[in-house]
């Protein structure tokens, strides 16, 4: 995983300036690591060995102007989106409104807005769709889609207003409307369990399928991002069991053990209808569960937005950011058990990459991505701690271990003997766990350095020695 953190002096611009850049961008041949030429610019991967690009930006709150500018920056950092969408295309945008309108009353939210912590935030939806329209997509050819738990979740929380304001259409995937009936969309010869899925025909008709999930842990699937969001692409009535409306029990349990069958279902849904573009909402979110109906749920604020044309790569970085191991054969569940890793399954079939070394990070938020991995500890930490680095002295890299007992923003920096900041290794929200981080000091001179960790009221420092 390489971070392209070229400085972005100003990632906000006026609507007029942005629109004027669209006409010029198509004729600009951009070099790698440069600021992109606008939404119409072609994606450039060059021969750098990367299989995918994930754009990252930071945002701490959901103001309309901020989110609009941030999503625009994501698209530009990807080199534009003209390689996945044309102005004449029909586009489906899948949101996540899991749990329905009554979720807002759950005590585990602790007063938080359900749109902030559990659902796709309406301002992220608005920003994506406004940019699509600015790009040239006809508004009536944009379809907001979701299999609703109840109509109120769409009508009363801003999603209907956005759809109407922009002149788009909404389709409830629980129903065949506006078509006469559902259709079966095949998964193909690489299926894991299902040969086809019953779906609204709109998912077969659109040229571009976009997923805008909420960045979350999942109690049964480990992580839920853009690909897991597709569980909500099939009608509830066709995949429940024993009349359990609201829960697609057959997708969880029909094939036997849930830790195997649910990942198979998720992967098969992607085979039936792959994504063309994904934007992950992690400005505010939740950890340890996908919703407050699960014991252990906690509100969180990761403060980031991510986007990619490779949904597997996007979910890989998102899973990694939330403390998971996206490269393994299994994903850890919040209760300590594990399930099959559907990212690995799809990557093995060539639908994208879940290898960190094959993913280039771009955008002005790459430093928010945690350059750490979970340490192999079985006991959850009881207090914050920062351990001495090893090896020490070192050249050119060294590893530090640290513990996070509760969800908290963790800041880890390297400073020199004069107290001058050399590098920020971490500045992001992290969930409970033990972690290890590696610092590469190739660019720095020999000498004494200090690594400082701050988390809430906790502050600690260790002395480290670089010898060359």
Language-model features and meaning:
Residues 2-370:
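N-terminal and secondary-structure boundary signal
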Residues 465-468:
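Short beta-strand edge segments in extracellular beta-sheet folds
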Residues 426-461:
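Short, surface-exposed loop/turn motifs with a glycine/proline- and acidic-biased composition
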Residues 371-390, 394-413, 436-442:
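Glycine-centered coil/turn sites that cap beta-strands in beta-rich domains
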